[in-house]
Amino acid sequence: MSDENNNGRNSAPGGRQPLTLKPRAAGSVSSGTVKQSFSHGRTKTVVVETKRARTHAPAGGNLAAPSAAERRVFEPQKPAGPAQAPRAPQGAGDGLSAEERAARQRAIELARQQEADRRAREERARAEAEAARAAQQKAAQAAAEPPAAPPPAPAAPPAAAAPAAPAAEAAPAPKPAPSPRPVPPSAPAPQAARPAAEAPPRQAGAGQTRTYQPSPDRRDDRPSTTTYRPERPSNRFDTSTFNQRAPRRDDDRGPRPPRRDDDRGPRRDDRPQGARPEGGGTVRYSALAPRPAPGGPRGPGGPRGPGGPRIGAAAPPATPEIQRAARQAPRPGMGVDRRPDEDDRRRDPGKAISRAKGAPNRREGRLTIQAVAGDADGAERMRSLASVRRAREREREKRKGGAQEQARVAREVVIPDVITVGELANRMATRGVEVIKFLMRQGVMLKINDVIDNDTAELVATEFGHTVKRVSEADVEEGFIGAEDVDDHLLPRPPVVAVMGHVDHGKTSLLDALRSTDVVSGEHGGITQHIGAYQVRLADGQRVTFLDTPGHAAFSAMRMRGANVTDIVILVVAADDGVMPQTVEAIQHAKAAGAPIIVAINKIDKPDADPTRVINELLQHEIVVESLGGETQAVEVSATQKMGLDDLIENILLQAEVLDLKANPDRTADGSVIEAKLDKGRGAVATVLVKRGTLKRGDIVVAGSSWGRVRALLNERGEQLQEATPSTPVEILGLDGTPDPGEPFAVVENEARARELTEYRQRVKREKAGAPVASASLADMMAKLADKKVSELPVIIKADVQGSAEAIVGSLDKLATDEVRARIILSGAGAINESDVLLAKGAGAPILGFNVRASKQARDLAEREGVEIRYYAIIYDLIDDIKGVLSGMLAPIQRETFLGNAEVLQAFDITKVGRVAGCRVTEGVVRKGARVRIVREDVVILELGVLKTLKRFKDEVNEVQAGQECGMAFEGFQDIKAGDVIECFNLEEVKRSL
C-alpha cells in the first residue's frame, strides 16, 4: 500500500515545497516519500518526515573526546575482508556536511560488502555451511580478548565519529568481536578477514562543543526471561526509529559497566546494532527485504546486531504464525520475530531499503497482508475480534469445568397484530435460531422472515420468560374522544330534541309552527328526505335544538342517527291514521337510544281525528301515557292551526330539567356528524352537532375518514359564527371530503395526528370494501354457480347529500334476490361530472341523480358515449324504477297445464315410420303439438317433447277426445310397450316481479 524513499530531498508532487517540521536543525529531521496505492490503480505520493530526539550537552561544558578503547568498543563492527579504498567525498554542492557525507560513504561501503557476502553465501554448498560457521566461531574466539582500557563512556554512533578529512582513514584495524556461545566443533574452513577502516574522532574547533549522537538503548542489558508473552500486532507503517535516546551524562555514577554478552543468550526483542540509514531514518522491512532468519548467517555486529551469534537456548518460544503475520514494523527498543522458513537472502535490518527505479527486488503486483508478511501462499487468515473473544470465552468455560448457561433477562416485549420471527427475536434479545427451534418443537416450520400472529408471538415470548404487551393498529383511536369532564366544570346546555314518526304525519309542519317558518312548501313531494337541524330561541330566552328526521322507510338510518344524538324524542302520530309501521320503528330507535319519549298527537283539527285510538294503539308497544298512569307525556297539537304548541314546549323544558343536561364548554369540541354534502362553490360541507366543548374557527377537525381546518361556521340561517357552544348545530367548511353521517368528530392537536387517524380509517374502509361477502354456506354457493347465475344491474348513484345516497343504497340492497341484484358502482354526494360518465361507460351502468344535475360537459359526454342519466326528486320514483328493471331481469316461470292421458293398447312396427302406438284416450284430450311424456307403472320414463304425429284411423287429426282411439308415433323412441300411459300437457311462461 505504500512505498518509502528516504533520500533526504523534498519531493512533493507538483514541485511545491511540502509542509515541514520547524525548526529544522541539521540531522534532526529525515524526510521521505510514501507512495499510497488505492483501488482501481490509483496512487498518491506523500512526504513523510521523521523527527529524532535531539541531544543536549551537559551543563558543565564540553564533552571529553572518547578514548581509543571506547572507539574500539562502540565502533560498528564491519565484516572481515579486504579493505577497500574509500571513495572521494562528494562536492559541497550537494548540501551535506562532512559528517553526513562520511556517514553516507560508510553506509554505501557496508551495503556493498553485505551484498557481496550474501552472494558468496548463496554460492556455497549446503555441506560447507557448518565448516564456515565453525571457522567463523574460531576466529571470533581468538579476537575475543577483553580490552585493557576501563569500560568506556557512551560513544557516538558512526555518523558522529566521521573523520574530518579523507586522509585520516588510512590506518585499517580489525574490530573486536563479541564472545559467542560455545558451539559443537566442526570442520574448519578458512575465511579471509575483511579489515575495515577506522577513522579518528573529529576534533572540535576553538570555542565549539563537540556533540555526540544518541547512544544505543541500554534497556536490553536486563536479564532475559523465557516467559513468552505474545505481542500486539504492530502497524507496518510505524515510523518509530531506533537509537532515539539521549546519551548518558558523565556524572558521579561512574562509567557504564561492561556488556554482559558472554553470560546470557540473546533475547527475542534485541535490537539491531548495524549501520543506520542515512540521517537516522526509520528502518522498514518488507516482503522484499525481510528480517534475518534466526540461526542463519548474520551480518557483522554485536551479539544482537548484524553478524552476531545466533539466538541460543535462552530465546523465547517461537511466535505464533498469526502474530508474526500481523507484526509488520519494528517497535522501538525491541527485536523482530523471524520466520524459520525465510531464506537467508535478507538484508541487514539496519540498512535502509532502496526504492530507486529499476531496483532488482522492486515490489510488483497488488500489495496484500500475506505479501508483506513474506508468505503469500501459506499465511493464515486473520480471525475476527469477535471470533477470538468467543474462543477465549470457551477456553475460560472449559477451565471452569463446563459452560454455564447465561441467565436470561426478562423484558417487556411489545407485540403488534402481526410480526416476523426475526423481529420477535430482536425484541426478546434472542437469536433467531432459538425462536425457530422452539417453533419447530411445536410443529411449526417457519423461516426468519415469516410472519406469525400475535397469539403465537405471545406464546413464544412467554416461553422465553418475557412479559407481553400487545398493541394493535386500532390503538391509534385511543384518546380521539377526550376523557369525561369533572362535575365542577359542567354548565347547563340546551336540550336536543328529535322529531320522529311516520311519513305524512306532520313532523316538518310541527317544526315550522314552532319556528314560524315554511319548510314544507319547499320540499319535493311534500316529504322530508333530509335530516335537518335547527335551534329555536324561545320567548323566555331559552334555546332548544330540533332535529327533523325523514319518515320514509328508506331513511331508517337517518332516524337511528337522530335518536342516538338526541336527548328527547317527540313521537308524532296522526290522530286520523294512528300507529303506522314507521311509528313502531321510531319507538324502537328511541328505546334503543334510551331517550325519553313525548307523544305529540297531531291533526286533531280533522273531523275523523280519534286521539283515544292512538293512545290505545300505543299500549301495544309498551307506551303508557300519563292519563293511563304511565310516565310518557302526551300532547294534542295541530301544526296547521298552531294548537297546543305552548303545552308541547312546556313539556320539553320540563323533561330537560329532569334530565339535568350539562356540558363543559371550556374544552376541545367533539360531537356527531348529522349530514354531509358536496357543494359546488363551497366544497365539502358537514352539518355537525356539538356535544361538548366549543368549536372555533381554525380548529383542526377529524370526522370519520376526513379531516380539515375549520374555515367557516354557519348556522341554519346561513349566518357565520366565530364559535359553536354545546348543543349547537352548525355547518363547517374546510374538510377534505364528505364524512359519513353519524360519524363522531373531534378537534385534534395538530395535522400529524389528524393524518394518522384518517389514514388508518381509510385503510380499514378499503379492507372492508375489498373483502369478499361471505356466503351462507359452501353448498349454497356451489348450487348458485352450478344452477344459475345471478344477474346484476350496475348503477351509479349521485345525491345531493350523503345521507340521501346512503338511504338509496340501502333501499336497493333490500331489492336483491338470489337471481338479481343491483350492484352499486359508485355512490356519493355532489353533481354529476365527466368522471362519473366515463366510469358509467366502462361499467355499462346508468347514472341515477337524486336532486342533482349533470354539468354541461358531462351531458355532452354522456350523449356522445351513449350513457343514460336519470334524474329523480322523490325517492319513491327511483326505487320503483329500479324495481321494475330488476323484475324484467328475472327469468319467467314455466307453468305446466294438464291436457289428458292416453293408454297404449298395442305397439306396431310400420315400415318407414317405425314403431307406432295404438292408444285409447282415457282422460281429457290429446292435441297435436302438445308436449308428451311416457309413464310406466306410475314412473315417468321419458320426456318425449312435442307430439308431431296424431292419426285417427288413417287421417291426420289435431286432437282426439276421451274414449276415442288413435295412433301416435314418436321420433327417437322405439321402446313403447302395451300398458304405458302417454301424458299430454302444455307449458306456459309467466313473468315474475319483485
UniProtKB/Swiss-Prot annotation:
Primary location: cytoplasm
Basic and acidic residues composition bias: residue spans: 98-131, 216-235, 247-273, 336-350, 390-402
Biased composition (Gly residues): 298-310
Any single Gene Ontology cellular-component annotation: cytosol
InterPro entries: EF-G-like_DII, EFTu-like_2, IF2_assoc_dom_bac, IF2_II, IF2_N, P-loop_NTPase, Small_GTP-bd, T_Tr_GTP-bd_dom
Residue numbers spanned by region G2: 526-530
PROSITE patterns recorded: G_TR_2, IF2
Polar residues bias locations: 1-10, 28-40
Region of interest (G1), residue spans: 501-508
Region described as Disordered: spans on this chain: 1-405
Binding positions (GTP): 501-508, 548-552, 602-605
Region spans: G3: 548-551
Protein source organism: Phenylobacterium zucineum (strain HLK1)
Alphabetical keyword list: Cytoplasm, GTP-binding, Initiation factor, Nucleotide-binding, Protein biosynthesis
CDD domains registered for this protein in UniProt: IF2_eIF5B (cd01887), IF2_mtIF2_II (cd03702), mtIF2_IVc (cd03692)
Comp. bias (Pro residues): 147-157, 173-188
Residue segments, region G5: 638-640
Name of this protein: Translation initiation factor IF-2
Domain tr-type G: 492-662
